[in-house]
């Protein structure tokens, strides 16, 4: 069966499963080295001084952005993490003093006491991506909705974080899908 015989949602589900399987097959040592390499590529992002960067706390076998977030903090950027809220994600400040609470999805988020920030740069987890900046998330649409809301108040640079093995030749984009502006993998940064 060709992909032309199925809906974009079905194609995405198949690609998501394939990419997550590839990611799961990576060795523990490779995952650690890849996560550390993100920080080595921090200057390739070419971020404006003092911008606010939204990261994420990794779940399952996602590439770990914490070394990159530490490198960004050392360069003077303010950091924040997503919190699932209605109608879309909000972002709370991440500092060394931040207290965390359980945030669902097996992750932690800053407590409600942390300041809510509007990021200039959004670092996003993903299941799969292609060379045009299309991404497949985990199917809930949290980041697509957050991007739509954030873009109402100004420019937003959306950067996916992933392992190279998560790249697919072509990811279908539906009208509600928000493309990335760039991707950062263990091999470096690419702008779309």
Where are these regions (language model features)?
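Short, well-ordered strand-loop elements centered on a beta-strand within folded domains, enriched
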Residues: 87-93, 134-136, 158
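N-terminal active-site beta-alpha-beta segment that forms phosphate/nucleotide-binding
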Residues: 2-117
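Surface-exposed, charge/polar-rich loops and edge strands
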Residues: 1-10, 14, 21-24, 113, ...
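A structured binding-face within diverse protein domains that lines the active/interaction site
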Residues: 109-110, 125-128
